[in-house]
């Protein structure tokens, strides 16, 4: 399968099965499209059929010089020979067997608090309660969860634990106890825990930042962008004050204190801010250089829900963001945007491409009372 598109002055050709990405000139771009119906998908290199080549030459010569056309078709042949164009997905028939394999648990998401100190309008967790009662995870439940992870992780050395909510900092003492317990399990079991925490920042202080900088491999800071956007969707529980003003100075200090360790500012865009590229730019202007902003998830009848007719605007925003992304990088003030962080040299391995997301098999969530 071939996927072709043009963006920011680049002609991009993707060969899906091989994972190859080619940046080409106009004549090669058009040649690839002309030849795809003829060549289709091949298991091994083939020659471009003589008739197909002549037909392509005739068609392309209407627009491009004959010498350029010949060179372009030769380049297409080189890519076919290198098995980087028109390749067949040789693993397609193995998907069923692969997904039936016995898996190990690699990661847990600990719902350390089914409670929250903000009243975000789009919260899928119903202000932290997850359509149930408010609760904080006990150390005993968390301890059993870590024991379960070690016992069911097989020979895997690196394990991940996410502290999530609600707002995890509302149960901070248990977070610290579980990190300490996890560290005690590492050497006897030949494991290494990678801890992550997601926070709205309301309860952040220097002690928490220092602990996280020692123990947390990654920190996710929840913020939606511009003040008016953030405060509309992320109000305080009592409706007084600005969550933006409460959290932004803390997040700026926290990000700076990470000193090279992973963090990112994570926002949500809704129908109210389809111009979300402005919010990403706002993150960068605040001094953050690691960021993500995701489309809201919600019922179709919610006023903030994204609708099908919004998609063209959303696609346009990603294009605008790409322009700004390149511009700022050239100016020496670049930033990383999560969805643009694609390693073109080290793409997903075959196992990952076949298995997809590990949620529910390799990655499980644990409620405060110990349910998976």
Which residues fall in each region the model found?
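Accessory C-terminal segments flanking Radical SAM cores
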Residues: 1-30, 338-372
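Flexible, acidic/Gly-rich N-terminal and inter-domain linker regions that tether
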Residues: 1-106, 118
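Short, histidine-centered active-site or binding-site loop motifs used for metal coordination
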Residues: 16-17, 28, 126-129, 163-165, ...
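Short, solvent-exposed loop/turn segments at secondary-structure junctions
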Residues: 18-19, 115, 168, 202-203, ...
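Short, compositionally biased low-complexity segments
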Residues: 43-56, 119, 150, 285-299
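Conserved alpha-helical substructure of the radical SAM core
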Residues: 64, 71, 75-79, 83-210, ...
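Radical SAM/AdoMet-radical enzyme domain recognition
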Residues: 142, 146-162, 171-296
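Radical SAM enzyme [4Fe-4S]-AdoMet core and its adjacent flexible, acidic
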Residues: 228, 232-245, 252, 256-360, ...
